[in-house]
Amino acid sequence: MSELSGELKGKHIVLGLSGGIAAYKAAELCRAMVKEGATVQVVMTEAAEHFMTKVTMQALSGRQVFGSQWDDTAVSVNGEGIANNMPHINLTRGADAIIIAPCSADFMAKLLHGRADDLLSLLCLARPIAEVPLILAPAMNREMWANPATQRNVAQLKQDGITVLEVGEGDQACGEVGDGRMLEADEILADLIAFFTPKSLLGQHVLITAGPTYEAIDPVRGITNLSSGKMGFAIARAAAEAGADVTLIAGPVSLPTPRGVKRVDVKSAQNMLLAGVKYADVATIFIASAAVADWRPANPADQKLKKDGSDGLGGGVPQLSFVENPDILATIAQSPRGKKGLSGEQGGLFCVGFAAESQDLLSNAQAKRIRKGVPLLVGNIGPATFGQDHNALLLVDANTVKELPQASKRHLAQQLVADIAARLGQKT
């Protein structure tokens, strides 16, 4: 099991399958949840067994799979025998959540009306509502999803306190294209991890810059750096999981957008500044993790420079002159709201800077924090961690230095988000 695994450790999940072609994705979801440390108890409807076998789900979950309330060999989530042969009661006792994936239009309608004519609907109805949340991953044809009856059902289920995940869009098994597809297993897993994450940043709007910038020399060449953006993207994911509204301003990287995050793609430092100033107006926390180029070519060519001089520009090695790029962190941190954030005033923007150094990390980080005018500066040794999945961080404020030892960037991002929430006086 990898270091990133274990985010569902200790969780007991009842995975329900209703009938639908998307049942094949449930196999991958089951495997992924088990890999993350969860105990997974699978319950299938009769219709689901037309699309996926019990043998497959039993092999992946490592547990007996149930399909009928009359199964007389039932065991509970905790592995104990059910002496009273009431799996619709016992399977949910001690469970942390029930997730139905796929959840068909028919099964949603059944839940809405409180019908209980099979084991899966029975255990959903009999679950302790305050203790065992119910999560649905819809899967159906686009017309079925768009049908007013389905949309009314979804709205009422949400009003009843049931979590209904969004649907995917794209090619469907019937040959049509549109929304209504069940999310992919990794998307559902991410949503499930977020569901269990304490909402320490609920009500906050976090603005994050990530990745490198690209400064053009001519239309096909430019100057950039080795930043992968992985740290910033990990922070964006962790902040969204903690309940924040997150806007991620990303330089030129090829990373997937974290679930629940609004992404704004930019290229140059000037582009990033314009976007940063725009979105800082509504943000309450600004985290500047991007590796912004300090300089840019003063006069980028409007056509490709030719070595042989055929472009009429003389050929040979181009003579480049540079101008300084805008200081994005300082510009936002020294704004009126940024200054309020530094002093801890109400309505301020709490700014967090990053320093990627090659040596003398502590002294350089301390100096940069003062120079930029931010309450918190995060330092790391850049050349050793660019593009890597692991890092070590140093959190520097006016009075203390806190070391976050070598760990995955995912784990470090979670630690950083928890630290920021604590500094803002919110529960972690």
Which residues make up each language-model segment?
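A cross-family phosphate/adenosyl-ligand binding-site feature
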Residues: M1-L136, N141-T428
